[in-house]
Amino acid sequence: MEIFSQKDYYPTPSSNVISYESDCVSKPVNSADLPALIVHLSSPLEGVDYNASADFFLIYRNFITPQDLHDLLIYRFRWCIREITTNAAKAKRRRIGEVALVRTFVLLRHSILNYFVQDFLPNITLRLRLIEFLNDKHIEQYPKIISSCIINLKKNWVHCSKLVWENIELNEPDKLDFDAWLHYSLKDFTQLESLHKRGSRLSIYARQSFASPDFRNQSVLSLYKTSDVFRLPEKLQSSNSSKNQRSPSMLLFPDNTSNVYSKHRIAKEPSVDNESEDMSDSKQKISHLSKVTLVSTLMKGVDYPSSYAVDKIMPPTPAKKVEFILNSLYIPEDLNEQSGTLQGTSTTSSLDNNSNSNSRSNTSSMSVLHRSAIGLLAKWMKNHNRHDSSNDKKFMSAIKPANQKPEMDAFVKYVVSISSLNRKSSKEEEEEFLNSDSSKFDILSARTIDEVESLLHLQNQLIEKVQTHSNNNRGPTVNVDCERREHIHDIKILQQNSFKPSNDNFSAMDNLDLYQTVSSIAQSVISLTNTLNKQLQNNESNMQPSPSYDALQRRKVKSLTTAYYNKMHGSYSAESMRLFDKDNSSSRTDENGPQRLLFHETDKTNSEAITNMTPRRKNHSQSQKSMTSSPLKNVLPDLKESSPLNDSREDTESITYSYDSELSSSSPPRDTVTKKSRKVRNIVNNTDSPTLKTKTGFLNLREFTFEDTKSLDEKKSTIDGLEKNYDNKENQESEYESTKKLDNSLDASSEANNYDITTRKKHSSCNHKIKQAVVRPASGRISISRVQSIAITPTKELSIVDPEQNKSNSVIEEISEIEPLNLEYNKKSALYSDTSSTVISISTSKLFESAQNSPLKQTQNPQREFPNGTSVSETNRIRLSIAPTIESVVSDLNSITTGSTVETFETSRDLPVPHQRIINLREEYQRGNQDIISNTSSLHELKTIDLSDSNNDLESPSTHAKNNKYFFSPDDGSIDVASPMKNVEELKSKFLKNESETNSNISGSVLTMDDIDINDTSSARNTRRANSESAFTGSLNKKNLNEIANMLDDSINDDPITVALMKLEGTYEKIPEKPENTKSSDAIGIKTSKLADEVEMLNLNNLPSFQNSPAEKRKSLLIERRRQTIMNIPFTPDQSEKEGFTSSSPEKIDVSANVDVAVQAAQIQELIGQYRIHDSRLMISNNESHVPFILMYDSLSVAQQMTLIEKEILGEIDWKDLLDLKMKHEGPQVISWLQLLVRNETLSGIDLAISRFNLTVDWIISEILLTKSSKMKRNVIQRFIHVADHCRTFQNFNTLMEIILALSSSVVQKFTDAWRLIEPGDLLTWEELKKIPSLDRNYSTIRNLLNSVNPLVGCVPFIVVYLSDLSANAEKKDWILEDKVVNYNKFDTNVQIVKNFIQRVQWSKFYTFKVNHELLSKCVYISTLTQEEINELST
């Protein structure tokens, strides 16, 4: 403190400790020591420069830590207090002290108000340091000027705390009560009693301040006057003479990554041109990537171009910008009409030779099919609609439309470009199109599609191999009539759904959500590979039943999302999963109901039909297959059931769509099922309702769809009609008799009203069923299962669990997906299992240990109202099953139609008939109690893959977890990593309070950031809640419900929150006594409930998500994945355990949340990197068929869409990354935007922008190189000149420079024949444009353009100039005297450059261009030629 009284610092710093720029009026600091800087900023004699203060707080972290800085400010403040209090007689000295005090106060207030999230929130020590200073014990003795300053800082601190933590109670006094504020003592969040911070959590403001570059940039600009226009410095003195040798190509294309400019490197894959050549001059290698910059939503949402063929060419004329546009042979009419997928294209017609809705696309020429773009389309469509070879080829064409994969179809539809070169009448076009020579297409766009299709093809091949092993070479057959009848209905539904990206909620960087599609396909491929490897390894051992089969079965059951299955006495119909176009955004926006995942079954032929008469079971011993976890972008396989005719064993089958890189293997079935067990299983299934089957035959992994409610209703009525024709009376009778027997035994054994069992119709082989499965957004898993058995009685006769077998865990240990904890959990709980159940339920015997605990029987059957007005009597037994059913995602029709939330997990495990649903009493009770608050829960986990469709989104499992006390069932098996139980457990640990709070509306309403958007209002949530309540209101007796809900449940082992949190900490151990005796765990539950609250309040596990609406989720996956790497910051102190808060270090959070994602990302990148072109139509030897797609569009449209893309990418650059120059000096070597998309999580915003810039330059050069004729080259070059001219008008300097650099490249300049043909007007424009990147006077032309921008037009700045300046400036020293005198000028120059950049990026918000998804997709998903191909074509 004494330092501020020394003569070098009092009253202002002397030239010994500070120096100023001599030639500037504002006297900016050139160099200074740290105390002198503080004195300068709080100078009592000079005017206050608020801009200089704001700049200081942006850059000080480069030379002093926040803690040291605030210590200095506190010392300065206390020095001022001493000056005021000890110099009462010296008026002048006292006056100087007062002015310095106020100015120091301004600095502290600025820091608290604007950098609370960045500096204080992650640093508990700093927070406590400042709180200690503000809680000054002597505040009452100070003069009012001092106490007023301190009280003002206290108020600011309270304000910021409330801004950062929602619902925090600080008990601060009234704002005007001066005396109360004098005595008010601040407390840190961690020092509050748990009562006062209950329900609090990090706010949207806090999260965006961490993770959203755009929000952070806006916050910085808000510190300055809006009238300020920052300018780039005209002069930059670099200490390195290499600056004089720089050239534009050096700046933009460092040798190591450019495809076009690298002459000495042999690369198998072309690398991205890197704009940061200047940065390679700087020897400072930045080792870590930015954790803040992310791909913006605009780019990510861009649709793939639908066709890779050029539609039209615009005519070049002597006048500028008169363009001749190619007519498109491939613009599907349904693209604009939103009606269907590819049926408007030539794809299906080329396969079935039938007339098509697009007359121009018709073709009957096989040469077209094989040699032209149409052949490629046919190949891709076949890939989407992969069918088993045993299918009757005659009906392939009818099947196609129903099985297509909408997101892949849309990708092809939007990206593909096919054109005709000459303007003709439509009839002439049609005739010419039949000649394959005239059909030209954009080969580069087609390569982008083929890159994804190759993944899809690989997946199909793997499925085929897995099925071959599983089916033991059994060739399933298909009942053609049934299939045909089914497809007629399918096609009708298909016409109602269409994939169309939203114009409001999309990411221009990935408008077709390709990142999500590719991620899910890649996950599927990885899982299938693991499955296949395990199958091959275990082939011989699988010949005998494994001793740990029971444990494995239990694990599989736990992985099931739905426990429904459909049995037809001994006959499983072969099923063909149909893909419906689920992309009609219009049909989605009207309902909030969850998507329906539909499967349709067709039947096997007569060989199977014979078995219909006898209710025997079949064995499904195929290995468990883990398919793609595509949230919406993937389809399930057409899997036919494999069952040897003479086998009567029971088995559980499941297909897990897992994002986990490892897939569990399956083990062989066992023959331990009693006859009675089979009977029970036959009885319990009601086949009137939609059911789910696992299939092993068909090869299309992607054939599932999400249906809207309307189409499902129509389908149900259709199916009901069809089913009536196939009723089998004989089976009905035998079914009914066994039902009665079972009822008697149930009454005798359990005393429970467990009447879930209803008579069911029997159907012959021509059944038409809707198959449903649950998609779990939180984990990105889709699980399909046939449940092994149902726990409805505690009778030992049903037991199929052998404790002796379960003692062996050899097979389980091989399954790397299972955590050691879960293994322990599994082994111990299995030993205590006295029920046959391996489904997720609590056995009756465990629920009701005594007659006293059993519920009273209902005297009346509860009534259930249905939308059609009918009231259906429910069975009068209590539902004990708590298996997660399809109902947990697909709510009842009446609740969907009211837009309400989905039902709880405690719904009936048996599929309901269309007009009847059995309601769990506990569920009914809890609905009433909790007001269905949980309906606001949505996607939660960091690792989540967005499963939303274009405008619809699935409810989260945690919705039901809140209501389901019995969801965690230790006595039935382990909670598997891949299981929904595990997912819900994780979600509960993150988002639910301890049990005592779950019945309170307020504390139970835990919204995640996914659910809250900035614009979200509580009224919307209240409306949803009201809908839910009205939808679920039933006529059940509340008193009886109350009794049932309050019954003891002895089967719960631990508080699930406790278990989850202990697992998170690695301290969980299963209590080694019987699961029934669980009271010993109560103490642990109480002890850790505080921890659960803290985790919830701070939301440590789910920091990086901000979207809430389904439409927002449409674009969020890419952004969410990028954001998720940002916030690995500890928000709570390790040392505050005495307050009941344990450590939540970033390591723990990071490990639990991000390890999986990192492993997956690396595997996906490797998969994409393995792509090689095999199709001759896509090779450069076929360049005579190439026409760039830009010739199909006018240059104005192309410029607008390119501007939207660049705007979003530059919006991902964070001011701090730019200031610190956080970037790689060697960009990734990629040849397509897809390859960049899958790497985006590892790239900072700067790296992403540079890579995109270089990719675009390479793409422009590649388009010109691939074009064969000089005339066509001329057209392409002219079109790019026109686009560049429009970009200059739009002030989109990034795209402008991309085009200029590409056209200026030596490769393009070689084509003198083409340049000679260019129109004079366009040559004049080109002469003007190519002066812009001139090196004269330090890029003065581009600097003048950037400094003279009109903000209202919008602006996309040329990032390379800024990076060049920052790199040159980085060569200066940080310190003039090491750790004493800082080179302040260096940092001040940096901040001026950064402010200029982020200001111009913010001006891009003034663009009002309309999105053209087809063109945007083509512009986003670009590919380039490889290094070798460029060399070959340019020589």
UniProtKB/Swiss-Prot annotation:
Biased composition range(s): Polar residues: 621-632
Stretch list, region Disordered: 235-256, 338-365, 582-689, 723-747, 851-871
InterPro entries: Ras-like_GEF (IPR008937), Ras-like_Gua-exchang_fac_N (IPR000651), Ras_G-nucl-exch_fac_CS (IPR019804), Ras_GEF_dom_sf (IPR023578), RASGEF_cat_dom (IPR001895), RASGEF_cat_dom_sf (IPR036964)
SMART domains reported in the protein's UniProt record: RasGEF (SM00147), RasGEFN (SM00229)
Positions of the N-terminal Ras-GEF domain: 25-157
Gene Ontology terms for molecular function: guanyl-nucleotide exchange factor activity
Cellular component terms (Gene Ontology): cellular bud; cytoplasm; plasma membrane
Tagged with keyword Nucleotide-binding: no
Keywords from the UniProt entry: Cell cycle, Cell division, Cytoplasm, Guanine-nucleotide releasing factor, Mitosis, Phosphoprotein
Basic and acidic residues bias spans: 582-606, 723-744
Compartment(s) of residence: Cytoplasm; Bud
Compositional bias of kind Low complexity: 237-249, 654-667
Keyword presence, Secreted: no
Phosphoserine: residues carrying this PTM: 271, 559, 689, 808, 810, 1028, 1109
Start and end residues of each Ras-GEF domain: 1194-1434
Main localisation: cytoplasm
PROSITE patterns in UniProt: RASGEF, RASGEF_CAT, RASGEF_NTER
PANTHER family according to UniProt: GUANINE NUCLEOTIDE EXCHANGE FACTOR, PROTEIN SON OF SEVENLESS
Other comment: Present with 304 molecules/cell in log phase SD medium.
Subunit structure: Interacts with CDC24, CDC42, KEL1, KEL2, RAS2 and TEM1.
Protein name as it appears in the record: Guanine nucleotide exchange factor LTE1
Organism this protein belongs to: Saccharomyces cerevisiae (strain ATCC 204508 / S288c) (Baker's yeast)
Lineage of the species this protein comes from: Eukaryota, Fungi, Dikarya, Ascomycota, Saccharomycotina
Gene: LTE1
